Amino acid sequence: MSKLFSDRNRPIHMGRFPTERLMRSLLCPDLKALAPWPMLGFQRPAGSRSIVPAMAEFQAMMDAVRDGPTNSVISEIPADLQERSNHLKAFAYFNDIAMVGVTDLTVDDYLSSPRLNPEVGRLAHALSTRQTKTLAAGIDMIMADLKESMAAKPGPITHHTGALVFLVDYRRDPRPDEPGCDWVQDAQAERAALLGAETATVLANYLRVLGFNARAHSATTSDVELSRLAVKAGLAQVEGDQLSHPWLGRRFGLAAVTTDMPLAYDQPLASVQPKSALKSLDWILGRHGGASRNNHDPYAVRDYVSGAHPFETLKRVEYPTTYMDEPNIARVPKRTDMFARAQFGDMGPQVQKGATGGHYVRKAAPSAAQRRLLGAFVLLQDGEPAQELQRISPEKAGENIKGASYFLGIDATGLSRCPEWSWYSHDARGTPIIPPHHHAISMIVDQGFETMEGASGDDW
């Protein structure tokens, strides 16, 4: 179901869900009987076709860079604590987190034994032998920082005073016989963990860029009890020994960031919610302009393989409408792209200075925060295929690729041939490229409208 109301007047920090309609309590419920948040692993039995093991290395990378050096100079930020919390919430909502809460951090919130992702150690060993092939500005600094983070032992965070807690809602469970869903069966918790860790890792780095100490905590690596923090931050209620949300039930994942930045805290949810909150028009119809009971999950009424948008209504043609003289299209080296040319000074010293060390990215704190994780992911862009080839028909492979990409949050996926002229002739190091693949998977992400760039047409 599409949106019926506009959200143009809804502040970004309030998020998609009408959480302001939920009743709050001045007192926190008893948390003694609350079960710990489950420790999550990304392993599957040998021979499984699940996508979850392929996600493990990315989760480990985020767990590896969840902490890092803090800027020695504290940036100028709002003195009003509520304004600070609103800014950080808006950042998380811009990254598509479902709900965000802020709470204080007490000694009871720490785990007696911190959880550590066992994949981080294996990843550290693998990275010591991998080489990057990119000329991305400042990649040398990113790699040095990454190796330092891998080698460093996490210190105590008892000086942290508050926590930002992130809730990631589950999508519909794929049907066992659903086309395109062979790879994503029983992967809801891992999907939520991956998406939550992404925002937590970036936001923790953002706080460190601003000069405040911060550390991310995920379902696989954490120093704090996520269940307790979720209740205190007003993201969940206590139901027996489990967590529950008035609208989502138990279908969500959690991540958090602890920090020493002073913030304004949210109140816990009341144990009993009024009917006006559970059956309000804001929740049922989305009158507030955001997510509603009927549209918060686009796949409630669509198969994953079809995507969230009605692509089936678009007209298709056999060949592109733009003419391409394929036999005469020249292949050019990677060195000719504008980022490489800027670094080598082809466009003058001023542009070269802006590209040095990735300054054009680092000059904005949010971009600098995102850049660290993006640079770390560069090392995971390639890898060795499994020795055993799994037989799968082209039609089924195409369906599974689309189904998996949409399940993980991509907005549009297309499959096509990948002709030789679409490849660079040489990589960033000058090594000739012999095209190894003849097929391409193209994916685009909706950039949204919250920034001027997205609102001015560069929205994908």
Language model segments and positions:
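Catalytic cores of enzyme domains
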Residues: 98-278, 391, 395-398, 402-460
